[in-house]
Amino acid sequence: MTVMKFDLIKKEGKARRGKITFPRGDIQTPAFMPVGTYGAVKSLSPVELKEMGAEIILGNTFHLWLRPGTEIIKKHGSLHGFNGWDKPILTDSGGFQVFSLGKMRKLTEEGVTFKSPINSSKVFLSPEISMQVQRDLGSDIVMCFDECTPYPATEKEAKESMELSMRWAKRSKEAHGDNPSALFGIIQGGMYEHLRDESLAKLKEIDFDGFAIGGLSVGEPKEDMIRILDHTAHQMPEDKPRYLMGVGTPKDLVEAVYRGVDMFDCVMPSRNARNGHIFTSEGVIKIRNSKYKDDTSPLDPNCDCYTCKNFTKSYLHHLDKTKEILGSRLNTIHNLTFYQNLMKSIRKALDEGRFSEFRKEFLASYK
């Protein structure tokens, strides 16, 4: 029996306003989850994440399993005890990271054998091992182990990949056993609507605490992503959280909420920050461009983050040029605050019954 509870508070069209409750805290949805691959959101402390409004973060099963290993994390009680984040944590299953290894992996019915990116030793990961690792991490939301279908994939390839993921989903559920953490199933099927339907039907049969859409934002054109979202999101169970994995840009988030998605994660705000790409209410600023060298305005006059209240574009340009660590940190604080503020604005618009109006205005002003 899971300790998670989901309340659907309000709907506007397909867009949903909800709340996910855990013993460690509530998550107001739609929600964006900052990614803490190795247990930390790069350059930020748990206090800073809370200040910007994050209520849940994501940890990476694959990377934490390889380093430092679950024995060390278990000595701290859980990943929460290890990294000092006392609110909910979602851990992915490691399936996407294995997919990212490409030719360095060998896939069988049992699981995946691959060379460790740390020391090149031979490593084996299966649904059962993934569930045990996530149990050891003590995460609040556990993702079932799947194979992320590559793009492009023929219909035959997408079908075989999806069917393997469904067999692994069943094994994940069995291995999850009496773990009170929530277990989410992942819909696969590539760019083929009928395969997505088959996948969702099988996952409903197995029965999960929440449902995720996987295999998007893997290199496909934006119109394909929207087509699959249009087809799939509203068919997911109404009474359970809906999670779109690894997406995306601010526009992607607004468009996915419009189609009925509740939860998101993406490395984009933090990774882009380190490369000098800043999200603002009017679009993206590339802070290393020379035009910002003597620009004394803040990154975004509509933002109340620490960076915008205290520093100019000129200073941030200087930090970027001199490769100062502080530059990456200040950019990350801003970008993740921007994402959390966007989710707050979306939730407020849904609360007030004006989300479709908000969406139109946002898509018109955000370049």
From Swiss-Prot:
One of its GO terms (cellular component) is cytosol. Keywords: Glycosyltransferase, Metal-binding, Queuosine biosynthesis, Transferase, tRNA processing, Zinc. GO terms for biological process: queuosine biosynthetic process; tRNA wobble guanine modification; tRNA-guanine transglycosylation. GO terms for molecular function: metal ion binding; tRNA-guanosine(34) queuine transglycosylase activity. Zn(2+) binds at residues 303, 305, 308, 334. Substrate binds at residues 92-96, 146, 188, 215. InterPro entries: ArchSynthase1/Queuine_TRR, TGT, TGT-like_sf, tRNA_ribo_trans-like. Pfam families: TGT. Homodimer. Within each dimer, one monomer is responsible for RNA recognition and catalysis, while the other monomer binds to the replacement base PreQ1. This is Queuine tRNA-ribosyltransferase. It comes from Francisella tularensis subsp. tularensis (strain SCHU S4 / Schu 4).
